[in-house]
Design a protein with these regions (language model features):
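N-terminal activation segment of mature serine protease catalytic domains
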Residues: 3-50, 60, 105-106
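Generic short N-terminal amphipathic or hydrophobic helices
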Residues: 4, 9, 16, 24-25, ...
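Catalytic nucleophile loop of clan PA
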Residues: 46, 174, 186-209
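Short, solvent-exposed loop/turn segments that connect beta-strands within catalytic domains
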Residues: 50-57, 198-203, 215-218
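Short beta->alpha transition motifs characteristic of CBS
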Residues: 62-68, 160-162, 189, 205-216
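Serine endopeptidase catalytic core focused on the charge-relay Asp
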Residues: 28-42, 55-57, 61-180, 199-200
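C-terminal cap/linker of serine protease catalytic domains
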Residues: 205-267
């Protein structure tokens, strides 16, 4: 697939928000939008609200190597550390919304009685989880916001390095291809699962996975803006595996997507 970003012939986007304003927003996010996860070592996660029926479902997004299907099946208890407090949750099938080892991502529901913390969630227009492999003809209009992401765009990561306080790392987008992001932000152990955001408009565009073997760049996954609305007819949006291809469910675009997202009915 041709790299869509290269086709635009745009090197750097204008930064409409001053660094001072950006740092103020980052300070707010540092306190209650991300957490350190103590499980299989230490990693980072961030809080998002995803659309479900007529409401937004609060979840934590992290990597599959931080929380995996074995943790769910074993009902493991894990601790999430925020700057303003700690949350302990027991993993089970009712919490699991999505996990995929190949894509290295996990989404876990956060319940109201899990905490009394003032969590600030990334919401719908901040970006949300999905992965696509579409040519331009197949692209639905809700992917148009991707046209506003440029190579060499200034970005930052919010993360909890291992045994350290929260850390902000700045860098540039080096490449976007299909669902993959390459960037050059400075990373440390424990950074996996960090949100990747644009400096110019604070949009959440990705999740950091790890560094390359040669350490020439760092790897992440793309989070798509304006996630597909759940169908009023089909109460669950089922995303299934079809021959390993990253394409969308037939009801939406005659195809389907890697992995399975099972949003269960409310009791």
């Amino acid at each position: 697939m041709v790299d869509r970003m290269k086709e635009q012939n745009i090197s750097t986007s204008p930064e409409s928000i001053s660094l001072k304003q950006t740092e103020k927003i980052i300070e707010q996010m540092k306190n209650n939008s991300i957490c350190r996860i103590n499980n299989h070592g230490k990693g980072t996660g961030f809080f998002v609200k995803i659309p479900y029926k007529l409401r937004l479902l609060p979840v934590i997004i992290t990597t599959n190597h931080a929380i995996n299907i074995d943790d769910i099946q074993n009902n493991k208890i894990i601790s999430l550390y925020l700057n303003n407090g700690k949350m302990t949750i027991k993993l089970d099938d009712n919490r699991l919304r999505y996990t995929n080892e190949k894509l290295d991502i996990t989404i876990i529901e956060i319940k109201e009685n899990d905490h009394n913390l003032n969590i600030k969630y990334f919401e719908l227009d901040d970006g949300i989880i999905n992965y696509f492999n579409l040519n331009e003809k197949e692209r639905p209009n809700y992917l148009d916001d991707l046209n506003n992401i440029y190579l060499d765009e200034s970005i930052y990561l919010l993360n909890y390095p291992k045994n350290k306080d929260i850390f902000v790392s700045y860098g540039k987008l080096l490449n976007i291809n299909n669902s993959d992001i390459r960037h050059n932000c400075n990373i440390k152990k424990g950074t996996s699962g960090s949100p990747i955001l644009l400096i110019n408009n604070q949009k959440l565009i990705g999740i950091h996975f790890d560094s390359s073997n040669q350490n020439k760049y760092n790897k992440g996954g793309l989070l798509i803006y304006s996630i597909i609305e759940f169908s009023k007819i089909k109460k669950n949006l089922l995303l299934i595996n079809k021959e390993g291809k990253n394409i969308i469910h037939q009801q939406l675009l005659d195809n389907c997507i890697i992995g399975e997202l099972d949003i269960k009915e409310d009791e």
